[in-house]
A protein has these predicted regions:
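Active-site-adjacent structural elements that line small-molecule/cofactor binding pockets in enzymes
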Residues: 1-175
């Protein structure tokens, strides 16, 4: 229905989850995320095609098979980019990216360019690439005010990242 209301402009993005603890509430481990993601993405495709959903009387109405051409996949890995490319989906890149062990200051483009290259190499002939990179914009009256507003959340996030085993260099908001 939303695609009808937007006159065919709906784009839909999916990702397997960003942190290992994201899966625990669903009774899954992080290691199971790839298979679970593939299964659920297949279910979405089936629903959009109008296939039955667990019972002959259960179908998505109205069916929306056109949405399969407007899927975006979020990934941190070249393997995920290859799967997205092979399926002809768009590639979503994050504003941040886990750094390889021992390289906490590796620039974002050094991590994401190989992901983009893998995606482009995997696209079927004739399929136009679709790549987006999310970025954060924080608007404030001054740099000092922006830091003051952001500091509590950034400190909390840094604490959570450290607890999850990530290396966070520095101890100030500007680090």
């Amino acid at each position: 229905v939303l695609d009808l209301l937007t006159d065919g402009r709906l784009e839909v993005g999916f990702g397997s989850g960003g942190t290992p603890t994201s899966f625990l509430p669903f009774g899954l481990t992080s290691e199971q995320r790839g298979a679970a993601f593939a299964d659920h993405l297949h279910l979405i495709h089936s629903a959009w095609r109008g296939d039955t959903l667990s019972h002959p009387d259960n179908r998505l109405y109205p069916p929306a098979p056109q949405l399969a051409e407007r899927i975006w996949i979020a990934t941190f890995s070249a393997e995920g980019a290859i799967r997205a490319g092979q399926a002809g989906h768009g590639l979503m890149l994050s504003r941040t990216q886990p750094r390889p062990s021992g390289e906490p200051r590796l620039p974002l483009d050094a991590i994401q360019n190989p992901i983009i290259d893998a995606y482009l190499a995997a696209l079927p002939d004739g399929v136009a690439p679709r790549i987006l990179a999310s970025r954060t914009a924080f608007v404030a009256d001054s740099h000092a005010h922006a830091l003051q507003v952001a500091e509590p959340g950034l400190r909390k996030q840094a604490t959570q990242h450290r607890a999850a085993g990530h290396t966070i260099e520095g101890d100030s908001v500007t680090d």
